[in-house]
A protein has these predicted regions:
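Non-catalytic cap/lid and distal C-terminal segments of serine-dependent acyl enzymes
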Residues: 1-113
Length: 113
């Protein structure tokens, strides 16, 4: 008889926050696309290290492909890492420097970004 195993998602050691951006460019646009957009931002654990207040970080803007949206890049994946999990692994294993990653929602009524 097979044994039952408990599977838990990896813990998110770093931070993922959501900001709201009000775009004056999209205000009153003819397609009726919302001008207020969520912007997810990944902040590495080192960002909160108070001993290094003046530290600077590289910033990457992760733009989703056509018909994709920023929030979709954060989705759970059953058999592989999502983007945040990959960032966690690469930063923790020192294969990547601590980096801020911005995931803007650029989806439009045309279905693209």
């Amino acid at each position: 008889m097979p044994t039952q195993q408990t599977v838990t998602a990896p813990s998110l050691e770093n931070r993922l926050i959501t900001l709201q951006h009000n775009s004056s460019v999209l205000a009153n646009n003819p397609l009726g696309d919302p001008s207020q957009r969520p912007v997810n931002v990944y902040l590495p654990k080192a960002y909160y290290d108070r001993r290094r207040k003046n530290r600077r970080f590289a910033v990457l803007y992760s733009l989703a492909g056509f018909t994709g949206a920023g929030p979709g890049q954060l989705n759970w994946k059953g058999f592989e890492e999502n983007l945040v999990e990959r960032l966690e692994r690469l930063i923790t294993s020192k294969q990547m420097a601590p980096t801020i990653v911005v995931f803007p929602d650029c989806f439009t009524a045309f279905g693209g970004t």
